[in-house]
Amino acid sequence: MLIDLKHGDAHAVFDMEAGNIPVWTIGGRSPLHVAPWRDEPEVQDDPNVADVDKRLAGDFFCMPFGRDDVHGHPIHGPTANAPWLMLNAEGSKGVFANTLPKMGDAVVAKEIRLVGESLLQRHIIDKGRGDVTFAHHPMVRMEEGGRLSFSRKRAAMTDPVAQHAGHNLWALNQVRGDLNLDCEDGGQWDLRTYPAGHVVEDFCTLVESRDNTLGWTCVMRNAEADMLLVLKDPAMMPVTMLWISNGARDFPPWNSRHTGVLGIEDGRALGGQGLAAAARDNRLSAMDVPTVLPLGEVHVIRHAMVSLPRPPGWSELSAVVLSRGTLTLREASGAEIAVPFPEGHFD
């Protein structure tokens, strides 16, 4: 069942069966990616493809994030693979719920709200037992690449194992103190540039600076001449995981046609290493970065996306400041724009 939400010229759709947001349009822009096989019958009927991949689109909430080698859920957990229950949906806001029996009947409530250029989400997690990883999973596609900007990070790292063996640009199992990752060929890659000219499948984890009160990632798309700003509460989501999917997956349903895609996956996890590893002492927990969320109490996870036209000449953000209902975006040149943003969302 598809639920429509509207505010002014903004329109979003929540797919209750898939748990994702396959449509978000605002001002003629469509910031989110939709997999090309989403409506292909042969993929939808394939029992070997997880539901989250069959209906891959937009943004969805993963719990647990990635591999669940504790409870045995499919990749990204029941919140990304099982139907949601609608509690209320009217106008610009929808509220939905999902229950996780294998995690002590933990309940996840999802609130989606459209306000101007922003798509706001809150996830309220209640009850349950044990520890769990989680992350948002918004995806954007770039026809001709783009430029990325980030809030301050104190580390960048890659997983010990590749997403698709032999198809990674970045060297495995590295930890860096800047945004320049070592590559398999001995060179370096600036994470602020999407690797549009490389057929690769890559993944890295960025660790938020300790003093950040607002975490953000900005993608400026070249061909589309727009920008997507993704905002997070860094206290709840101390890492940003970047998924690069640019044609390297040559097996069904991907078949080398999933190109130019970037996942901006803010959450609490040990990269792509699975729930069991995240629940143990690990290299992130050694940095005092939590990699799991303890169930059994109420947690509120706040996230937002803002879609804007890219001002002429802009290529990189140097700062994003939220104050009194206004987001101020500063470009590397010093130029600024102010964008209204709902007060209280990140309080």
Where is each model-derived feature located?
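Surface-exposed acidic/polar loop and edge beta-strand patches at domain peripheries
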Residues: 1-120, 131-347
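Asparagine-centered strand-capping/turn motif at beta-strand->loop junctions
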Residues: 124-128
